[in-house]
Amino acid sequence: MTTPAVTQRDSTADADGGAVPVLGLRANWRQFWLLVLVNAFVGAMVGLERTVLPLIAEREFGLASKSAALSFIATFGVVKALTNFLAGRLGDRFGRKRVLVAGWLVGVPVPLLVIWAPSWSWIVFANVLLGVNQGLAWSTTVIMKIDLVGSKQRGLAMGLNEFAGYLAVAISAYATGEIASRVGLRPEPFYLGVAFAVLGLALSQLLVRDTMTHVRHEAASAAPDGRRAARTPRARELFALVSWRDPALFSASQAGLVNNLNDGLAWGLFPLFFAAAGLSLREIGLLAFIYPATWGVAQIWTGGLSDRLGRKWLIAAGMALQGLALVAMVAVRGVAPWLLTGALLGVGTAMVYPTLLAAIGDVAHPSWRGTAVGIYRLWRDLGYAVGALAAGLLADAFGMAAAIAAIGVVTVASGLFVAVRMPETLPAR
């Protein structure tokens, strides 16, 4: 198919004078970068908690058990995982923008609940709402960018999306750590969250446009092949396809789950691990910053790199690097070595994160892509719950260092599975 010339901002005229969407980052750059900004605010919402909330659990609510202290992450992960699936399905049925705005409406009360919480149950409930917010809003910004750019720049688009989200996670985590070191764990660090939620909601409602016309255009022009069936499967068929039947989608789903198992570990256990080593709040904030910051920045290159080199081996190598970084983290001591291992963990995650999303987009037909992304993200974000529970139970039984090392070994095994089982998904040029 010949790409039509761009005569409008993001569409051109067809033979009948109607508007035909043009796929590509350049043709849709205004909406694309607006969605990047929106996703930065989504990421900043979860970054609020990464430095201070595990410490609030211990110091303000007296939760000595690591599994109890990490319960908020498990709750967040389960809710976000289920909401991811709903977001994809609802977006395919009712349009992307409505789902995005709904996600922000649910997110507005989150920082207020944390500020006012008289008991730990309030924190857990706030993370139920945060899981819904992240599942609806982050999933939808991912799907909308895939809609806009088409197949040729899918990896780059996912890299830029995740760059914005996780750099914002890092900056928010560092900022809350700095504020907490000066004035306390609550309420001041969470005032930032009120601003993030209001700005994200305003941009989504007032400036973001829906992308369903791009979806219909791509679906009409997509040539079906063995894996990209033009018939839209039922939800049950799609769930089985993504979860275990298709080797590429299954490989991506298990790697995504283990990847976020690591992130759940880092979110919940790293601040406690570093605090037990005698580090200050400012140093803990710096270490909470370096992992998602490296992850976020490196995705600018790794997403586009997968468009050139392919998906499979970047995913396998990234999982192996993450696992080795976790094992190394418990073998060293001191802020500088931990900064290095945190950066290596971030690079490994950056190799994997946007590439997995791009691989899902490679395999899924445009007509059911949103649902496929939602199912993949369901499995991926269940990793938060699995990671929090596994890390907490292992830490209570064997110590925090043993928990971190054990999850590192699991991560290397996941990378080996990808190397053996996953076919290359990048379309032939």
Language-model segments: what does each one mean?
Residues 10-29, 210-252:
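Juxtamembrane intracellular "pre-TM" segments in multi-pass secondary transporters
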Residues 77-85, 170, 292-300, 384-385:
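Residue-level signature of mid-helix packing/kink "hotspots" within the transmembrane helices
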Residues 98-112, 313-328:
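Structural signature of the two symmetry-related core transmembrane helices
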Residues 128-166, 358-359:
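Cytoplasmic helix-loop-helix junction between adjacent transmembrane helices
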Residues 188-205, 404-419:
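Symmetry-related core transmembrane helices of the 12-TM Major Facilitator Superfamily/SLC fold
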